[in-house]
Amino acid sequence: MRNWVVGGALIPRVGGVELDGLVLVGNRRRDRSVEWTPPGGVIDRGESIRQGLEREVLEETGLTVAAWADLRYSVVVEAPQLGWRLRVEAWEATDVVGEIVVADPDGIVEEVRQVASPEALVLLATSPQWVHIPVGDWLNGVVHPTGSFHFRIIGADRSTSRVERIA
């Protein structure tokens, strides 16, 4: 079973300017579709979540995170038939500076947008449930008592598998 740790950056303001929304990145997938998500990615061995997030935000957006609020929520996704388990921590960036520049060394991020909440919710609908449900709840001010979400993928083929929300 492969275990991944991923960080997600919730960026509601850049350079002290409130966006009434978020910074989102358009990720090109293998099937050529685009999924919109907050910036973030896999945390490298030896990095803390926030160190990895700072690196990912800079690589994907050109922005520098100087300060973080507390952890906003966590997500666990289990995919036993695919042989992996994913743990995500989503942190809110409170001090972000710089100019948006797409320079993703992985070549996945194709576009970065600062969007208001209504547009963010539309764009987030392109992402998996374990991304758009927690981010959408956060944007809408919904706070879950445990601060965590849990999903399971049933099936071994992406085109026919289904996602269940456990908690």
Residue positions per predicted region:
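Short active-site-proximal "capping" loops at secondary-structure junctions
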Residues: 30-31, 73-77
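Unchanged
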Residues: 43-67, 76-130, 166-167
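Conserved N-terminal beta-strand and adjoining loop/helix that marks the start
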Residues: 1-23, 42-45, 73
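Conserved Nudix-box catalytic region and its N-terminal flanking loop in Nudix hydrolases
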Residues: 19-59
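Short, well-ordered strand-loop elements centered on a beta-strand within folded domains, enriched
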Residues: 18-27, 99-103, 160-165
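Nudix hydrolase/Nudix homology domain
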Residues: 33-34, 106-167
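A generic structural motif
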Residues: 12-14, 26-28, 78
